[in-house]
Amino acid sequence: LGPSDIVSDANHIYSELGFYNTQIGQAELLDRSVLTNEGKRLTGDSLFYDRVKGYGEAFDNVIMTDTVNKNMLTGDYCYYNELTKYAFATKKAVAVDYSQGDSLFMHADTLQMYTYYLNTDSMFRETRAYHKVRMYRTDVQGVCDSLVFSSKDSCLTMYYDPILWNNNQQLLGEKIMIYMNDSTIDWAHIQNQALSVEQLDSTSYNQVTGKEMKAWFQGGEMRKVDVIGSVRLVYYPMESDSTLIGMNVSETSLLNMFLENRKMKKMIMSPKSNGTLYPMLQRPPEKM
């Protein structure tokens, strides 16, 4: 077929080169043909579509956009089932969620999108990323092995060796849950073997470890951190000119930290601990 529009039910196909079998409802399309279904648009160098089974496949330079739920999938292979609303992408796969004020970008070996219906009038989407995951927003960036983002509660969960960056702060744990609001990150929960690291210079790092950590954000910056259970703190107090005074090592059960302009403003330990302050030239390497 030449330049053609094929319309059936809720579907629309535009193609300038391809074949469409009207008897079995199957199409094989080339030259950046486009399949549209209820606000979703699938295009690639080549397409296969089965109207009876309700699915389409796209190959090479694939873009799938969902204008209703405001997300996008790209890659060199994409599958979409219009009956279950399930989408799958691989080979240089990237997902973009632009349903909130700040877009969330996710890259992984494999990306999947699921649609769940709470009732006849309500639904939410879930994006799952597997292996070599990287995610980016203007306020936070992260890497991990697996990731799940749910539009139901705007929660992004990172699994297996997750690392999260916010400005000069680095957060690590066995699992990290990040809760978004419309325009920025709201708070994060770092579970099991939680660690926060802030680099001050080439050899000095503020470090906090604990069983778990809860971090609250405002305006895209970390403002308050609660560290709970088996807390160990390595902290470098500063002079007014930012000269490091020494290295303080403390241990406690609960630590509340308050930050302003990306710097420590106040710290509360329960029970209180004065710790040990080492001069800069006498820092024991095993405690750094």
Task: Locate each region found by the language model.
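Structural signature for solvent-exposed beta-strand/loop edge elements and short helix-capping sites
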Residues: L1-M288
